[in-house]
Amino acid sequence: LANELKAPVVADATSGLREELAHLALTDADALLRENPPAILLRIGDVPVARFWRDLEDIPSTEVFSVTRTGFSGLARPSAVVTGDLEAILHALGDVDPVGDVNGLRAMNKRRKALMEELLITCPDSEQAMVRAFSCFAADGDCIYLGNSMPVRYWNSFAQMAVPTENVRANRGANGIDGQISGFLGVSARCSRSWALVGDLTAMNDSNALALLPQLDTGTRVLGVINNGGGGIFRALPGADVHSEAMRNLLVQPHAYSFKAIAEQWGMRYLAIRTAEDFDQLDALEENSQVLAELIPDREQTE
């Protein structure tokens, strides 16, 4: 359907189609669509984890249609929903006429993508570049898990799109740091090679879940933790710089902790990744190894 419509596509991290639809997909779709809201948005499948889906609540000019097996609109505002088996519904549509890129989004996206790739090269130790590098290694797994907001946003915008990664799960929400490692272990329980990417506060909040490791089937598991010294998303929120230092500390919860002791406590191999070259440690992981990879980005490059 996407290839027939030839319209711009937001290939959500959890869709399993990011790589297959790369020729139609928008890079940094959240920002691009906020600045250029489409007149019509067609959602196929489950509710996306991308930020723009939440922004639709405040963009009533965009008419939303959903085709979903659950019947759940995923929006608090009015929208149209078609419920049923996706394959049957799409087959019933028959041939569709191409719509094309009526708003010129792909042209704008092309410029953004070129700039993004240049920045990833010039800032190799930024959070964004580290997520790109981590995604390249994670592509060899049969399961990928993302939690909470920033890992999901980064994956949508910066993860590799060359190697298909069909089994991607994500969890985010108002209490999004709760139970994320538990969620990863549950998702990966039957996987032979699985990868997860979470934030530092998220990992601290559920680190005791790693006690479950001996109860799981054998398999290689890599838990990637972005340690940016606190809740990095709260540093980037609009108006964050106008708060008092005390309020910023309450929001960000800054810390100087390492995750090495947590890895040792639960018998995991610990890897510290501070530079692009440090990712070489992920090249040859032992079979059935349990790894905690602490990604420690450069804040100046990130900003």
Task: For each feature predicted by the language model, list its residue ranges.
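Thiamine diphosphate
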Residues: 154, 159-303
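Active-site diphosphate/adenylate-binding microenvironment
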Residues: 107-191
